[in-house]
Amino acid sequence: LGVPHSYLWFSTTPPALMYEELRKAYDTTADRIWLANCGDLKGAEAQVSFFLDMAYDIDQFNENNVHTYPARWLAKIFGEQYYDTLKDITCSHINLAFSRKPEYMGWGYWNNYWGGGEKRTDTEFSFINYNEAGRRLAEYRRIGKKAEEMLATVDKKAKPALYQLLYYPVKGAELMNRMNMTGQLYRQYVRQKRAAADDLKREATTCHDSLEIITDGYNSLLDGKWKYMMSLRQNYDGSSS
């Protein structure tokens, strides 16, 4: 959880991984007392609930249903009519983060951190080989749009909860990926002396500014009820907020 990169921004631990480890613990007689070091509860509500539900009755879960837990948990809050949408968004969000957490998109040489600053490098997602980066960004844009659409449709009283439980983590992850991988493509275009590099620079800057805006939005919800709970600083340079 420390240098060179923490992962305290979003809770993206896959339910399947949690189930695998806790099922193993339960089956090897660690079935009386479980302790969880979950850090800040804010942002990890679904995972903490999953942990407690498994502690109460682990046999209700199996490898075929654990991946739907986040969607089922959210559907209980916002309505079963949203279950299919929530399942689509949450499963994709967790799968994308499993290949690379949003907090780790800066890449860089970790050992340079000790010199006071980490040198940013390109990601290992390629815009050329199988268009890995392009497909990743397209999927993030898709689920980010679905989260926006759901935020626009839920009841006004439910909007603050949906903003912090679904919209902010999904949109934040989208923008973080877009910012870093657009920056990567920008550097490639600069090396190739392509005029379109300026457009990519503007897009990356817009993503950065949008991250600031939605984070301020989170911290100002309900007259600042969750103020200071979210910070971008740890995700850029590896330090904690």
Locations of the language-model features?
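Substrate-binding groove of N-acetylhexosamine-processing glycoside hydrolases
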Residues: 1-241
